[in-house]
Amino acid sequence: MESADAFADRLKTARSASQNILIFARTESLIAGENVRDALSRAEKYISAGADGIVIHSAETDGKNIFLFAEMFKDMHPDVPLVFIPTMYNSFDCDTLHQHGADIIIYANQLTRSAYKAMLAAANSILGNGCSKYADENYCESVGNILKITDGDRNDRY
């Protein structure tokens, strides 16, 4: 994990390049096995360096350290947006996460992971049936609908 000072220097450089962007700095402390105090220290440095918001992430499933971080962070910076990424602590609903201090919630990889499972199911269907008809009917969006959302003028062919 990069030192907090080195990362803060990069944030200062980004901030000096433009005031017309929002910078959200992610602290990896809890992912890297550090404690809440380290995460708070890093967040403080990142805000001082020009970050507009803080992203906090954790590999723990109970949410305990995320919620403790959020409570302490919001006491110090009530107006700074705080972003949660509940990949591992996925049993908490949005209302609960907001009550614990999240201003923004990012479901970072759930759609990619679910797409992978759907691709495996489609591939197995094609291999098992020797054709794609069943996969098309059960696992695939129609070509027409895909074209409609990606290139509206060509959807009349399907």
Which functions belong to the PLM regions below?
Residues 1-87, 91-106, 114-120, 124, ...:
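Alpha/beta enzyme core
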Residues 110-158:
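Extended, intrinsically disordered, low-complexity segments
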